[in-house]
From Swiss-Prot:
InterPro entries: PP2C, PP2C_BS, PPM-type-like_dom_sf, PPM-type_phosphatase-like_dom. SUPFAM superfamilies: PP2C-like. Mn(2+) 2 binds at residues 113, 287, 330. It comes from Oryza sativa subsp. japonica. GO terms for biological process: signal transduction. GO terms for molecular function: metal ion binding; protein serine/threonine phosphatase activity. SMART domains: PP2C_SIG, PP2Cc. Binds 2 magnesium or manganese ions per subunit. This is Probable protein phosphatase 2C 2.
Length: 380
């Protein structure tokens, strides 16, 4: 007679094989725990358990939907005064309530890098919601379509120009105070970036930096040509020998009267993209970041940080600290927006199908166990 513990050790593989034939499960990853030795007394009451199986449930490819979460960090850097401001709203419809009907998820982010004092940037932060969504007749729609996004772009364009005029009308703000402005909006799978100035938005697409804005500086050929046509000039890399950017809100001491062509304008440039599983996160930063590092270097730092701790707030701080280490000479503001709950995507795709755990248990009576023993014994 074979000892009980030995019988148990032989039975487990037999039952596993039988289970696989009955279920005909495709794509099964199996983890088999070791079978512990048992006393003969315990063997008769033992329950033989099929090891836990990892079954990849067949699902249809799902349309990507961003799972938005973000973090930000701001630091005065080596400057005596802080002139940067920023806005971070991960749930825009939740923030605005009935004022907004738009495709979900939806979010709004803004970075304002002031110059000539903090007043213009502070004004933009204080009044951004009113300027962008309340006064601008922001379009209302629950479905994603081309006409909605065209209306959004037109509305944001008007908001930039309205903000510029508002800064001129506010007597509490110096006419020499101005600010760059970059706004990023997410509606459903669409990412829209509007920029006037040298803040920058950079998308990480499978680890590769994709710039979603262009720096409006005198060294940019298209801007240089426009400035010359308007009667302006570039001196030592500065617009009219004074300003390092060619687009900004405010700075009315440098702008022509309303209605006249001016070398310095508040007109935003737009870039739009449809987010996919390949799009991991977006970095928005002021020029204090980009003056000392490339877009790809910034993406690499944030990506490594997310792999270590998965915290966009910490990533924003780490990026700013890297800029300080590289001896930036400006204020620092960074926003990191992730599009998935984990690095590398949002909704599960067919290649990353959800895993379902299946446990199948079978207890054998003493009689059944004896029958198995007899069946396994060699014929004499």
């Amino acid at each position: 007679m074979v000892a009980g513990a030995e019988v148990m050790h032989q039975v487990v593989p037999l039952l596993e094989a039988s289970f696989h034939r009955r279920c005909s499960v495709k794509g099964v990853d199996e983890v088999s725990p070791p079978v512990e030795e048992m006393s003969p007394e315990a063997a008769s009451e033992a329950a033989i358990e099929v090891p836990e199986l990892m079954v990849k449930a067949p699902v249809e490819s799902l349309q990507f939907s961003p799972n938005i979460r973000s973090g930000s960090f701001a630091d005065i850097g080596p400057r005596r005064y802080m002139e940067d401001e920023h806005i971070r709203i991960d749930d825009l419809s939740g923030h605005l309530g009935s004022l907004l009907m738009c495709p979900a998820p939806n979010a709004f982010y803004g970075v304002f890098d002031g110059h000539g004092g903090p007043d213009a940037a502070a004004y933009m932060k204080r009044h951004a919601i009113r300027l962008f969504f309340e006064d601008s007749e922001f379009p209302q729609a629950l479905e994603e379509d081309e006409s909605f996004y065209e209306s959004v772009e037109k509305s944001i364009h008007n908001a930039f120009l309205s903000a510029d005029l508002a800064l001129a009308d506010d007597l509490a703000i110096s006419r020499s105070s101005g600010t760059t402005a970059l706004a990023a909006l997410i509606f459903g799978r669409q990412l829209l970036v509007a920029n006037a100035g040298d803040c920058r938005a950079v998308l990480c697409r499978k680890g590769v930096a994709v710039e979603m804005s262009r720096d409006h500086r005198p060294t940019y050929d298209a801007e240089h040509e426009r400035i010359t046509e308007c009667g302006g000039y570039i001196e030592d890399g500065y617009l009219n020998g004074v300003l390092s950017v060619t687009r900004a809100l405010g700075d009315w001491d440098m702008k022509m009267p309303q209605g006249s062509r001016s070398p310095l304008i508040a007109e935003p440039e737009f870039q739009q993209t449809t987010l996919t599983e390949d799009d991991e996160f977006l970095i928005i930063g002021c020029d204090g970041i980009w003056d000392v590092m490339s877009s790809q270097h910034a993406v690499t730092i944030v990506r490594k940080g997310l792999r270590r701790h998965d915290d966009p707030e910490r990533c924003a701080r780490e990026l700013a600290m890297e800029a300080k280490r590289l001896q930036t000479f400006d204020n620092l503001t960074v926003i990191v927006i992730c599009f998935g709950s984990e690095l590398g995507g949002g909704s599960p795709s067919s290649e990353q199908a959800p895993i379902r755990r299946v446990r199948c248990c079978k207890s054998l009576s003493s009689e059944a166990l004896c029958n198995l023993k007899k069946w396994l014994e060699p014929n004499e």
